[in-house]
């Protein structure tokens, strides 16, 4: 995956707590959620801005999970939050998307094609709203490899379990 694509992944996120952990293929966030890591081929990218960033070399692609826990963010419309995840793309074309329910919570999905630094890419963004937290999921890949990773991304997002049992302080 190109550096600009990773920049897009990082540019849309707020810094979070660093007390997350991975056990037996499950990522646990101190912000009250957990997700299963995708199947073979994806590796954790350490030191990213998101709580969990994953990358795949062949075919190239990246995905992330992150959460923002504050009343202001949680009060924004899902359409705005979802669009925010793909800011920075040029020549954006919304191919698919709309409201859905994930883990019993309202969510929004958008599949977008566009370009980043002149290179064509595909992106799929999913935002899930909890009571106080907003959970962001993003998958980005070069246009030629985009469809290859979408099944892994779908499985990753659908594994979401929200707990929100933290006591304040999470951002």
Label each residue range with its predicted role.
Residues 1-15:
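Sec-dependent bacterial lipoprotein signal peptides
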Residues 16-33:
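Bacterial Sec signal peptide processing site at the extreme N-terminus
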Residues 26, 34-36, 122-124:
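Well-ordered beta-strand positions in beta-sheet-rich domains
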Residues 30-47:
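Proline-anchored loop/turn motifs at beta-strand termini and strand-loop-strand connectors
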Residues 39-44, 89, 135-171:
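Surface-exposed amphipathic alpha-helical segments
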Residues 46-136, 141:
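Conserved polar/disulfide-associated segments of primarily extracytoplasmic proteins
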């Amino acid at each position: 995956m190109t550096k600009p694509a990773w920049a897009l992944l990082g540019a849309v996120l707020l810094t979070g707590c660093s007390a997350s952990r991975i056990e037996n293929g499950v990522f646990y966030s101190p912000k009250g959620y957990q997700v299963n890591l995708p199947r073979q081929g994806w590796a954790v990218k350490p030191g990213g801005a998101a709580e969990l960033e994953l990358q795949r070399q062949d075919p190239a692609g990246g995905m992330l999970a992150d959460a923002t826990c504050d009343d202001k963010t949680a009060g924004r419309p899902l359409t705005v939050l979802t669009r925010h995840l793909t800011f920075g793309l040029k020549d954006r074309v919304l191919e698919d998307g709309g409201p859905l329910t994930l883990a019993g919570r309202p969510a929004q999905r958008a599949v977008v094609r566009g370009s980043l630094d002149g290179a064509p890419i595909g992106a799929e963004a999913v935002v899930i709203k909890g009571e106080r937290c907003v959970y962001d999921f993003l998958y980005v890949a070069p246009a030629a490899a985009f469809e290859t990773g979408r099944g892994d991304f779908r499985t990753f997002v659908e594994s979401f379990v929200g707990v929100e049992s933290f006591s304040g302080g999470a951002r």
